[in-house]
Amino acid sequence: YANATPFYGAVVACVDEPMVKRILPDISRPVITYGFSGDAEFQADCREYREIRSTFLAKNRKKELGEINLNVPGAHNIKNALAAISLSIEMNIDFEIIQKGLKKYSGVKRRFEIKGIYDDVLIIDDYAHHPTEVSATLRAIKNGWRRRLVTIFQPHLFSRTKHFYEDFARSFLISDVLIITDVFP
């Protein structure tokens, strides 16, 4: 798949993912790497999570580019921002424009969507339907708020639930309380 990239293109890859790192030597196209790992070309340093915001210092080959302020929480969103930064820099977009654009981004519907606060309880709706997404979302909550986390989960599809039930179980260990509803068929 990566080798199908046109000769004028590049593959943007997160080196924090072991499977991605393993296939890098097999990619014949130019590769741009990002992640928290020290061997990534684009890195995030001095990461801070405060409620719905994430802040980090963006670096390119260890050289500081500047601070990025995101209006979405979590390490996974910082990695998404690093991917966008690396691609934007590759396309010669000015870093200040990248900063402004990322600061304006506030997420998409049903992904960490704050529904309201009721009796000092923050209600968040998130359509995480894979264990990796569930873990990332719950970790973002734990890192940003440092409060008790009650999770209500509605599994989608019997086949997915059966296939990933052990991974789902591990992902929910982050929660203080877990409520599981009926499977949505």
Question: Where do the model's predicted regions map?
Answer:
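Acidic, Mg2+-coordinating active-site environments of NTP-dependent enzymes
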Residues: 1-123, 146-147
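Generic hydrophobic secondary-structure packing signal
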Residues: 77-80, 97, 133, 137, ...
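Active-site beta-alpha connecting loops in nucleotide-dependent enzymes
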Residues: 108, 132, 138-185
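Short, glycine-/Ser/Thr-/acidic-enriched flexible segments
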Residues: 63, 75, 92, 129, ...
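Active-site-proximal flexible loops/turns
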Residues: 21, 87, 132-133, 161
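Switch II (G3) loop of P-loop NTPases
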Residues: 123-129
